[in-house]
Design a protein with these regions (language model features):
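A membrane-periplasm/extracellular boundary helix in multi-pass inner-membrane enzymes
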Residues: 31, 52-108, 116-126, 134, ...
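Alpha-helical transmembrane segments of multi-pass inner-membrane proteins
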Residues: 1-54, 58-74, 190-195, 213, ...
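Transmembrane alpha-helices of multi-pass inner-membrane enzymes
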Residues: 42-45, 59, 63, 185, ...
Length: 263
């Protein structure tokens, strides 16, 4: 909706409606008190900036490898710092809410998420190639819970939710093959969308729309490391609708025989 608001030539009424929608969405995001949503929006904005400024992929790869190396080298110190973090997700203070995302010692929500991730990994080890089948995690993960990972919100029946990760969900339900295919689809989506963005050089309104799609998709697929909602219509419809928009615009652009300098 921010991308639509930035497009030129919109009637005053249309702009007013979009401003109202954006305000509602921003207020909803803030008062959702959902840490994963806050973090994914921030990361998505960074992705948008990297695309906008055409940051070199090799440079990004170098920075990523360097960052991973530094984290590995300082891992013991990082663990000590994390162990001292006692902020809980139940607090209403914004700064403490953010800090609680790194609390892996006492925060029940974080610990339960770790429990679900471990279950997904154990399920993968049981059936590494093809997994347990689509949609089966919720019915199978109970048997793979480690007693040491159980929290106050865990259940012996394993009847409360999913893997809290699209990627680990695919790994446990479809095996290594399924997860690699899912990640390939995600990579293809971003490759196609970013390529489409750079093909539109002069049609600013279209570039703004495509950038909005890039940031929106990035926010979800980053969020997907911590939650999985593609099995619900509320998430699946907008995500795949945006993918369809990218396909449609790409076909339209190719059919017109224009790549750059579109009016």
């Amino acid at each position: 909706s921010l991308a639509l608001l930035k497009q030129k030539g919109r009637p005053a009424l249309s702009k007013a409606i979009l401003i109202l929608i954006n305000l509602i969405l921003i207020i909803g995001l803030i008062f959702s008190y959902t840490r994963a949503a806050w973090l994914s929006v921030i990361c998505a904005a960074i992705v948008g900036a990297l695309v906008y400024f055409k940051v070199n992929f090799k440079l990004l790869s170098f920075v990523a490898i360097l960052s991973i190396g530094m984290i590995y080298a300082q891992w013991d110190k990082i663990q000590m710092v994390l162990a001292k973090n006692t902020h809980e997700h139940t607090t209403e203070a914004f700064d403490e809410k953010i800090q609680s995302a790194a609390n892996v010692t006492t925060d029940a929500s974080n610990l339960e998420r770790i429990n679900r991730w471990d279950c997904a990994y154990q399920m993968f080890k049981k059936k590494p190639l093809i997994g347990f089948g689509p949609g089966t995690y919720a019915f199978e993960y109970a048997a793979f819970q480690d007693p040491e990972n159980l929290t106050i919100i865990s259940t012996n029946f394993g009847d409360m939710g999913n893997a809290h990760s699209e990627y680990l969900s695919a790994l446990s339900e479809s095996g290594l093959i399924g997860m690699l295919l899912f990640m390939s689809v995600v990579a293809a989506i971003f490759y196609s969308t970013i390529r489409l963005y750079h093909r539109y050089e002069k049609n600013n309104d279209v570039k703004i729309l495509v950038m909005g799609i890039i940031v929106s998709l990035a926010s979800y697929f980053i969020h997907a490391f911590l939650n999985n909602y593609l099995d619900t219509d509320k998430a699946a419809i907008p995500i795949w609708a945006m993918c369809a928009m990218v396909v449609s615009m790409t076909i339209s652009l190719s059919a017109s025989g224009q790549s750059k300098g579109m009016d």
